[in-house]
Amino acid sequence: MLSSGQIRGARAILRLGQAELAEAADISLETVKRIESMEGELKIRLDTLTKIKTALERAGIEFIAENGGGAGVRLRKV
């Protein structure tokens, strides 16, 4: 499961604005803003989360699972 911090971090790495992420994920800008403002577990539809994750991964992001050190995000090595 992704966190709002991972989504914000991924956007920062890519230098991607909220509107650009919304367009890439085919969701509304208001949805991106709402999700990024959430604390704790994201309470959103699975298809919305999948759209965001897929858009960011296509742009080169790799999500890091929480393995004792905390969840994270990084640019995928090519």
State where each predicted segment sits.
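A detector for short, charged/polar N-terminal pre-domain segments
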Residues: 1-2
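Short basic helix-loop element that most often maps to the first helix and adjoining turn
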Residues: 7-20
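Residues in the recognition helix of alpha-helical DNA-binding motifs
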Residues: 10, 24, 35
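DNA major-groove recognition helix of helix-turn-helix/homeodomain DNA-binding modules
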Residues: 39, 46-63
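Short, composition-biased local secondary-structure segments
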Residues: 18-28
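Recognition helix of helix-turn-helix/homeodomain-like DNA-binding domains
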Residues: 27-44
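Helix-turn-helix/homeodomain-like alpha-helical modules used for DNA recognition
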Residues: 61-78
